Each structure stands twice: as structure tokens, then as C-alpha cells.
Amino acid sequence: MPTIFVDGQEFQVKEGANVLEACLSAGIDLPYFCWHPSMGSIGSCRQCAVVQYQNAEDTNGRIVMGCMTPVSEGARFSLNSGSGADQDSPSAVDETAIEASVQAPIDVPTKVPDKGREFRQAVIESLMLNHPHDCPVCAEGGECHLQDMTVMVGHRDRRYRGLKNTHRNQYLGPLISHEMNRCITCYRCERFYTDYAGGTDLSAQASHDHVYFGRHQDGVLESEFSGNLVEVCPTGVFTDKPLLKQYSRKWDLQSAPSICTGCAVGCNILPGERYGKLKRIHNRYNDEVNGYFLCDRGRFGSGYINSEERLNYAGVRDFNGEFTAIKAQEAIEIAARWMKAEEGEKTQKIVGIGSPRASLEANYLLRELVGKEHFAAGFGDRESQVVHRIAAILKTTRAKNPSIKQMETADAVLILGEDVTHTAPRVALGLRQAVRNKAHELAKQAGLAVWQDAAVRNLAQDQRSPMIIVSATETRLDDIASQTVSLAPQEIALFGHAVARAIAGQPSDDEAVNEAAAALKNAQRPLVVSGSSMLHSAIVDSAAAVADALTDLFQADSTLANSTPADSSPIDSSPIDSTPVSCNSMLSFCLPECNSLGLALLSEEQETLSRLLDRAEEIGVLVILENNLNRRLSEEQVTKLTSSGIKIIALELLDNDLLANCDLVLSAASYAESEGTLVSSEGRAQRYYPVFPAAHERLASWQWLRDLAAVSGHSELAELQHFDQITAACGASNPLFAALAGVSPDHNFRSHGQKIPRQTHRASGRTAINADVSVQEPLRKLDPETPLSFSMEGLNRDQPASLTPFYWSPGWNSNQALQKFQSEVNGPLRGGPVGQRLIEPQTNGISQSSDFTPLRIVQEGRWQLVPMHRVHGSDELSARTAEVAELAGEAFIAISSELAAKLAVVDGDGVKINVAATAGIDSLGLSLSVKILTRVAPNCVAYSAGYSSTLALQPGALAELSKDSDWQRATPQLIASDRSSHANASQNNPPSPDTDIDKGREEPRHV
């Protein structure tokens, strides 16, 4: 590690780092704007200027940009010293001189004590020339990086008295608000949106000193990661629009560490609450999983928690089918009475249905309450087959199931059957970084540091690491793929097995197969990605076969297996980890819901919904845990279940169609109001904590089940009083869950003798927050189940990383304060890892390769239905958030341009879909809107999966298509304006060009 000197102090720094990164990692506050740890350096803002000296005798030095200057052995720099390289107390600034400079009249220049600081102050002053004086009304106020840096450099008075450049703002959709006047042209937004996330509809548009960041015209941002602009932007240009509707300042938000429930990736999040409402979601850094970024479903998809359709009280249905709200204790007693046989009566058979969106602890309690043999996981039949198959593969494979950080090191990627951007969005963002490993390799050969972002991109141009996508339809990653192949699901499985054989030395007659095999064989860290979206277990088998073949290849060639990987990211160039060299091959699966893998490991295919239906007459009581069976069973199957005389008890968050047929409904708390453990698709168990107490008589599902067990006479479960005890019991029940106890500290943990506060020390209005209801000062809510408190009292420091509720440090009020919680910039958090991996690769794993012979289902005049998932609309809960529902649009049928011509339809027309009756499924007919795709597998059409109107469609079914002449096209969505001149004007009427949208400022000098 090189040794450098900063203001006379000696620091050992990371090899290959730049000066800015080295200073921040050492705890030195050096201002910056354009640099970002995940996006590298471009040196555009000039804010991180430091003075570099040639040697110890040099007293003049020269100004260099910290983010563009690599560290070297013995290098000498100064941030605050004006007297040369060898000042004894360099960090001590001449406060008298600074005070004099601040208090001096603005028209009389006063000398600043050193040229580095003077330069940084000049940069801030120039950035402020056109910046508005609107901090009190800016949504970024109080967590603004520009505010922090302005204070840090000591700039206070503005000398510029001229007119400011002003801009018109754009409508960018329901998620992002745009205020261009606050821009400081750091280029972070464009670099993230275009360079990092692959977006194409936001850019820098400029003419001399007039720079505008936005779209070419108003419209919804197309990227699935647009919400990250809120955190990437150091000012208030891009802000959280849903938050603006119910705004609270950062310091007033109550937060807790949590896990996103939008998909199975397991991204770490920080939900914020005020007035009993979930206000927003911010990214919670986890260097192994989501890093600095979230997808838009994860960031904006939790609005359903504030929905008026939330269940506040338990309800029991009477003989007339009407529900009556009852107290929680009464509901428990009714349920226990149903579950216990009265004297002389036959013992009731109790069956439980779990849920892949409920916590591991809640599913465990339900399984123990009803017995393993009477517990169904709650997957649909085909989903159950695929998910359990994935779980079996992960438990036995020799390949590594990688984290997203490890995926970013891949130098060749094969994707089988998944549109990853829509089924595991954060994984897709990681794969976009993986294809840049070719650029990093070229940079290394040219002697460029990979953090020199602009230079590396200019060097590589369009050269990328190979990515082969084999799918039924176009995907959002097609733009970076080296090869795309369009095949039906059963043919995708055949393709995968053919690639495995080609890797093993049996070439195929299909050149596409041989090209894919060659790309994987020539890679040092190949990655195979597949998943459950096609509901086709043969596809996941073929992915496992490819990973097995690659592992065999690495084991046969120890030289290749032990080779040192090339640099893989702007900061981190470490190998995968200490896993045996046979695990250089990586295998990752995309799963449908947040706890799908955890539930599969817990249930082990003990019961399926079909088998449960076959013996419905034997069941006395059915307990359904957070599972809307209308999404997993056909209408006929649901009717059969609910009309069989079974007493149905449902635990649920939101009202849905199934609940109308239940006898007792228990109001469950959401993830933001309860604690639990989720197992991600990586096999990482992670804990989430309540952000605020559950309102009314909502209880966490595990609390309902614990109380029900106690009243119904289940003595063993009745002894489990605390959540930690349930987690420990679950861990003891299965060797795979043995690490659960180490996921997070128990409820007795204290930091410096106190619980960890969920509120900042600046939280306001504690005694007056409910004054509109009662003037009586409310008691602080207690939380006996976690190490966190619903209070500002305590210390948010030195605790395990899994317990950090928010990021703040003196002088760092924005989310950039994160670097004060990291062991090094862009490195792991202090306080240990977040979560525990439950599944590791097996040294002597069982091969999953198997022969597969597909059924030939092509029929003239019929097309095979394949599911097409959407990041907005396919998920059950997030789709009930207003903004997500707006983006989801209507359900659709996606077809090729050739088929569209044959049917004489265009985008937006209607198509009738007729599906013939098959075993157990009646014939079906419906009409859907047409979406025309650039590529679709032959003889296939895709439908929007997860939408309520397409739930009856079955993957693989054959459908007849015809134009619907009676179809009514959807009303075009007009572009809305955020700045209407009339308070009651419709949002769908944009202002005219003559509208004065900023009356409080000078007249615009340009638009």
C-alpha cells in the first residue's frame, strides 16, 4: 500500500486509488460533486482541487484535481496549508484569516489563507452564479450535497449581481420531479442514466454556457432505474415526486434498516416514515448486493402500505356474507375454537398455506402449527415445480451462486429464458457493468486506471465482454448483447443442453450454440443466468448443465482456474472470494418473490395446491398466510376450495377478491411495520425491522400465529415469546438455517448502553405531532423485539451494519454521509456484513445435467403463449401503488411484426385470444391490446404476466388469434405539467409556452 502525505500527515492508501478516494477513505473531508464511487472520475466540476508538491522542499506546489490524480508512493498533497509541503499542523486552518475574509465587504477582495482552499471557494462561487435562493422550499433542503460542500469550503456571500440563467422544467413521469434551475452541471445524472444504466432518453443538451439535462421533449423516463437520479443528483434537480405530495424533511423521518420485497434480489433499503405514513424509500448500501442503486419498483413500489384498502381490524363473516370488525383477542379466540375439536366431535384437520412474500419466521410458525404434512408452500403448481427445482440445484451444484458484486466481475454471460431487467432489475444493472470488463481489460493493457471513466470508455468504444441472450422475446439487455437468439421455452432448454455438450467437446450443428460455448470456454469468470419466469423446469436444468460443464472444464485446467481475474470495477478488482477454484463458474437464478427461495427450502415440496384441492373435503380449517390464491389458482379451483365448507382463516395486508370468501380475516402488518427474515435468490438471509409501529389492530403475521398457537393449545410454540426465539427455533429445525441466528443481533443488543434510535437527533414535533387528535403528550412507543427504539435517544454509531437506520455525520447531511460508515470508499460497511449466506457451492456436487426431449406443440393457426414480465405491473403488491399502476398501463399481447401484418393490426389495436380447453382448464377467450416487438420466437406470442386480466392465461397453452374489430383503443396519455398556472388545472394540460412558470425570479435569458 502506498504511503502519501496530506498536510504533513502520513496515510497508507489503497493501491491504484485516486487522491479524492484516498482522502475520503482516510476520513479527510475533501469537497466534490461530479465524482461518484460507482461511476469513477471525469474531473468536470473541479471542486476537489488540492495542492500537490514535488517533494518535501517544494513550497509552491501546483493545483491538481483529486479525483483525476492517482496516488503514488511518497506523494505530498495539501488541502488547507498555504505554507508548503511540510507544515506540522496542516489541518489547522487560519480561522482568523477565514473569519476576516467572510466578514469583509463583498467588493473588497480579501486573501484566503491557501490557494487550494481559495480555488475550491471560487469553484463554489461560480456554481452559485445561476443557482436559485430557494433552499427553504427545495425538496433537497437539509440533505443537499451542495449545501454541505458550500459550508465545507466556507463560501457564504455572493458577489454576483447579474441576471441568472433560468430554464423550463419538464414532466418526467409520476416518479421524478424536475427543477432544472438548481442544476450545477456536474453531469452525474447523464453519466448514471446513460453510461451506467443504459438509458437513452435523458442527456445533456447544451449551447455554449447553456446546459440542459433532460429529455428531448416532455415524457415519462423510460429507464427502470430513473429513481436513482434522486440520490445521484447532488442538488434538487431530480426529486422524489411521490414524496413531494406528502413532504417531510429528512431529519423528521423515522427510519429503520429493511429489505425490499419487490422481487427476490434482496436489495437493502431505508424506508422513512412520518405521521404514520410511509414517505419514501432510500437506498441502503450493501456492497455485496445492491451497492448504491435500486430499481424503480423497489424505490417507489411501497405506496400500497398507505393504501385505504389496508385492513385495520380483524373481521368475521356472518351468515349473510357480511364482515364485522372485531378485536384481535376475539379473533384469536374464534380461530382457536374452530381449530380445537369440541368434546365428542371429530378432530378437525387443519391445513396451512404459506406465502413466498411472508417472512421465514411466519411460514415456519404456520408449518409447525398445522404440521409439516399439512403445510403447503403456497406456490402455484408449475411455479412450485420450478422453484423447488432451483432450490435443489443450488443445494448441490459446484458452481457459485454469486452476489451482484460478483456478477459484475463476469467476463462472459449466458442468459437462458429471462428478461432479467423485469424479473430481477438490480441484477440486470449489475450485468450492464459486467460487459464493461472488456473495457477494463483494455484499460489495464494501456496503463489506464479503471476509475478514469471517460478515458476508458473512449478507449473501448463499443467493445464489450460477450453476453449471449436466449429468450422467447426481446429483452431490455439486447442493446449490450453480443448475440441474441429467439426460441420457444422448450427450445431454450435444448439450446442450453447443446451449449453444455459443446463445452464438453461435442460441437453442435447450430453455429449459435458453438459461438456461445466458445465465449464461455474462453472466459475466466463465466456466468450463467436463468430463472423461473417461463415456468419451465427444463430451462433451469439446462442452465445447471452449462454451469456443470464449465466447472468440469475449470477443474480439468488448473492453470485457467487459478488465473488472476482482471480489474472488474472502477474501485474493486478483487477476485470473487476465497471459494475453491472450481467455483470460478457462476450460476444465478431469478426467482418470483422476495422469499421464494426461503419458502422452498422450508417446505421441501411437502404439499401442493393441487393435492390440497383433491382432498378439500377432508379439511376442516384452512389457514392462508399472506397469499392471494386468485393469482395462483384458476377461478374454478378457487370456487371449489371456498365452497367446500372449509373454515378459511386468512392473514392479509390488503383487501382482495379472495377475502370475500374467507370466514375470518386477520389484519397483517406490512414489512414496514414488522420484523422478519427473507432469503434472497443468492441464498442470503437478511433481516428487516419495523420502521413504525403498526396502526390500529394490525399485527405482524408471526404475532398472529404465535398467539393462535398459544390459545389453541400448541405448548411448544406457546413458549416462543420473542421473535428471536422463533428465529432460533427455525434455525434449529433445518441445517440449512443454522446461520439464521447470526443474521442480526438479538433484541438485547445495545450500542453504548442504549438502543439504536430510528429518529435523527434533529427530529421535531415529538410532543405535538398528534396535537390535532389530542393535546395529551403521547408516550413513546416501545419495541421489545428489536435493538432499535422509536425515539431520537441513543447513538447511531459503531453498531453492526445490519442495524444502521440512517446515514448522517457532522458536515455530511446528504446521502454522501455513507462514506463515513464504510471501511473504505466503495468498500464494505463497518460493523460486518449484512446477512448470512445459507447455501455455498459443494466441492463434490451432484451433476444436474439431464437429457430433455421437448413435446412438439406447434400447430397451424395457433401460437404458444409465453409470459412476459414487467417491472411495473407484474408484481402483486407494488401494482397497487398509484404511480406504479400508472406506469404499468393496460395488459397486452406482444407479437412479431410479421404476425401483426398477418392479423392487420398495429400497436394499440385489440386482438382476441381464444384458448382451447385442456385437462383441468376450461376454454378461455379474452381481448388484449397489441404490442409489436422487434423479435419474438417463431410460433410464439407473449402476454403481460401478473396483470389481473391475464391471470387465467397459462404458459405453454396454444391460442388462436384474431383482430378484435370492436376494440376501443386506450385514451392517449397526455403529457402533464408540474407547474400549472392555475391551482385547479388538470395535470393533463401542459402550460402554454407563454405561461410564466417562475414569477419569483428574473425573466428567463433562455429556454
Regions found by a protein language model. Name each.
Residues 100, 506, 510, 526, ...:
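Long, contiguous, secondary-structure-rich segments that constitute the structural scaffold
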Residues 287-291, 647-687, 909-910, 915-951:
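C-terminal, active-site-flanking charged/polar segments
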Residues 128-132, 179-180, 186, 190-191, ...:
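Catalytic alpha/large subunits of respiratory electron-transfer oxidoreductases
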Residues 46-261, 265-269, 274-281:
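Fe-S ferredoxin-like electron-transfer domains
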Residues 171-175, 413, 684-693:
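Flexible glycine/proline-enriched surface loops and loop-helix/loop-strand junctions
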Residues 83-106, 555-582, 918, 980-1001:
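Intrinsically disordered, low-complexity terminal tails and inter-domain linkers enriched
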Residues 2, 7-73, 114-115, 119:
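N-terminal cofactor/phosphate-binding cores enriched in small/glycine residues
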